[in-house]
């Protein structure tokens, strides 16, 4: 089973992705629906915010790809905002709740890493950046 979305980096796209992933998880009776929806929501928000900071003059896209095998759900979100610098990735993945402050930034990945089994980052060609997560699911 597979879901592929290509959206512009806008608030409207965040709302569309939220509705789509909610429908997907409900229709296919995927366990941990709320967690999955939250993870996708946070990944898409990060991509939208990163691309809006780039202030592109031409239309760019965010790709949301969800695949479900028998026991694994895989989600990737790809944007064109050049990604998270290599040296900051380990800080993101090693942060913990004791270090959490009340700023508006940086909390999404902290929650995501506790809701999934695997998270990774990939620099792709032409300033494209991918964040992927995997979650084991049992029905």
Give the residues covered by each predicted segment.
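Bergerat-fold GHKL ATPase/HATPase_c domain
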Residues: 1-38
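Conserved ATP-binding N-box helix of the HATPase_c
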Residues: 31-58
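A conserved short beta-strand within the histidine kinase catalytic ATPase domain
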Residues: 57-66
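Short, highly conserved beta-strand within the GHKL-type HATPase_c fold
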Residues: 65, 71-76
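Glycine-rich/acidic phosphate-handling loop/turn and adjacent ATP-lid/helix
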Residues: 77-103
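Glycine-rich nucleotide-binding loop
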Residues: 83, 125-133, 137-139
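Glycine-rich phosphate-binding loop
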Residues: 101-116
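Glycine-rich ATP-binding loops of the HATPase_c
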Residues: 117-125
């Amino acid at each position: 089973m597979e879901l592929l979305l290509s959206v512009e980096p806008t608030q409207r796209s965040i709302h569309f992705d939220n509705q789509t992933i909610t429908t997907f998880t409900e229709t296919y009776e995927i366990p941990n629906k709320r967690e999955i929806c939250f993870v996708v929501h946070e990944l898409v928000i990060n991509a939208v915010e990163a691309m809006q900071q780039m202030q592109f003059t031409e239309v760019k896209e965010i790709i949301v790809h969800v695949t479900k095998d028998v026991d694994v759900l895989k989600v990737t979100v790809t944007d064109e905002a050049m990604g998270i610098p290599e040296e900051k990735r380990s800080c993101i993945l090693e942060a913990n709740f004791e270090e959490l402050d009340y700023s508006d930034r940086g909390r999404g990945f902290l929650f995501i890493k506790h809701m999934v089994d695997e998270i990774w980052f990939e620099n792709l060609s032409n300033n494209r950046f991918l964040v992927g997560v995997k979650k084991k699911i049992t029905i």
